């Protein structure tokens, strides 16, 4: 079996993407943070003692996307052209739904950057809110959509 990230000597390597054509790459990822309804209310009302939870999570998610290649072995450093995070309150399930859309024009996709963005944003929500709710859950981290490159446009069912 040929592995893409292993060289002839059996050592790890970063895949050579230099022969690929540049194309617009977009990825959308999601994470969900489940919590007690009271915790969600405090976040919404700005009553968490550490400060503006979603404002800090927004910045953390952007920073996470920008640092993906430093965190994930063999991820190519990318020149991101856009990182946008959105947060939605799910009152029925006492959850915050995080979505990140990441864009670039380049030779490789931004799926890992989008997934890292929502993961870091979710961890930030947890960190800033854990004093009032230690049993929050970070769930459903997944890629929702991607476009660009050979695989074209894909959307999760």
From Swiss-Prot:
Pfam families: MoaC (PF01967)
Protein name: Cyclic pyranopterin monophosphate synthase
Assembly description: Homohexamer; trimer of dimers.
Record InterPro entries: MoaC, MoaC_bact/euk, MoaC_sf, MoCo_biosynth_MoaA/MoaC, Mopterin_CF_biosynth-C_dom
HAMAP family (UniProt xref): MoaC_B
GO BP term (any one): Mo-molybdopterin cofactor biosynthetic process
Pathway: Cofactor biosynthesis; molybdopterin biosynthesis
Substrates-to-products reaction catalysed: (8S)-3',8-cyclo-7,8-dihydroguanosine 5'-triphosphate = cyclic pyranopterin phosphate + diphosphate
Record bears the keyword Lyase: yes
Source species: Syntrophomonas wolfei subsp. wolfei (strain DSM 2245B / Goettingen)
Catalytic activity, EC: 4.6.1.17
The family this protein is said to belong to: Belongs to the MoaC family.
Top-level taxon: Bacteria
Role according to the record: Catalyzes the conversion of (8S)-3',8-cyclo-7,8-dihydroguanosine 5'-triphosphate to cyclic pyranopterin monophosphate (cPMP).
Residue ranges of the TM segments: none
Molecular-function annotations in GO: cyclic pyranopterin monophosphate synthase activity
Keyword tags: Lyase, Molybdenum cofactor biosynthesis
EC main group: lyase
Protein residues bound to substrate: 74-76, 112-113
Positions annotated as active site in the UniProt record: 127
């Amino acid at each position: 079996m040929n592995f893409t990230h292993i060289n002839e000597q059996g050592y790890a390597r970063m895949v050579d993407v230099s022969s690929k054509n540049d194309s617009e790459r977009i990825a959308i990822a999601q994470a969900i943070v489940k919590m007690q309804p009271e915790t969600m209310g405090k976040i919404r009302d700005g009553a968490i003692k550490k400060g503006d939870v979603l404002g800090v999570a927004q910045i953390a998610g952007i920073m996470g996307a920008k640092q993906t290649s430093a965190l994930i072995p063999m991820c190519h450093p990318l020149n991101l052209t856009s990182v946008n995070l959105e947060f939605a309150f799910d009152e029925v399930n006492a959850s915050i739904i995080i979505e990140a859309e990441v864009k670039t024009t380049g030779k490789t996709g931004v799926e890992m950057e989008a997934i890292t963005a929502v993961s870091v944003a979710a961890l930030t929500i947890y960190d800033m809110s854990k004093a009032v709710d230690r049993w929050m859950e970070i769930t459903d981290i997944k890629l929702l959509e991607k476009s660009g490159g050979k695989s074209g446009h894909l959307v999760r069912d």
